[in-house]
Amino acid sequence: GSFDNHFSTIGLVGMNEAGLNARWLGCDMSDERTQKFTREVLTHMRNRLSDYQEEYPGELFNLEATPAESTSYRLAKHDRKRWPDIRTAGSKGDTPYYTNSSHLPVEYSSDIFDALDIQDELQTLYTSGTVFHAFLGEKLPDWKAAASLVRKIAENYKLPYYTISPTYSVCKEHGYLSGEHFTCPKCGKKAEVYSRITGYYRPVQNWNDGKAQEYKNRTLYDVLHSKLKKVHTSVVTVTEDDVKIEPVETHKYLFTTSTCPNCRMAKKMLEGEDLE
């Protein structure tokens, strides 16, 4: 084995709090000034990674909105200990944590499109994993509501990944329960509440203290009452008279890299084919 096809991943955490603590900003990610600063930081990071790519031939680098499930709590806890007056996420007296990557504060808005309008300009600057989580209190009323939301996001925003993430609970006696129920409404016994911590669902009771505080602070999105304000797509009617089809010469291309073992296998298998 080798590391030839592995990426060196670079990310950031707590950009929202960087805006709060920066004396020349003093505002969170909902403010245009911190959004502008974040775009500049991410663009600088992209450029540096591009330089590294040229400086270290054969090495792969990517800019990712790293999950930071434990790091967002650990760094905030140590920073608070060293600098007691530092601004972390949440309110005074909360367990310290940092907002993940360049996300908005978790209590920002119940209107999902308000959040998407801001995140769309930031998440598209990452070159690797990034995701917008649509945290919902309960599941949507039916599949049509889910399909409608997915379509609106897909047609009006550029961000690459998003999740529909309702909260649900599990009772040992009665199984699945929609929404947050620490006690089963049917039998009164203790139930487990599940929510998405970063990229996957886990019982809230097993989260670290920082993520547990983040869960408490979340403002859930009210999808049914959210309003799409910026329509980014337009419909253009094209008739047959508008279209002129000209014959084009076609070629088959095989794109490979020098370090990919699968590319070498593909080239060997396709020997004799008319490829460029």
For the regions a protein language model found, what residue spans apply to each?
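Long, C-terminal-biased catalytic regions of enzyme "large/alpha" subunits
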Residues: 1-242
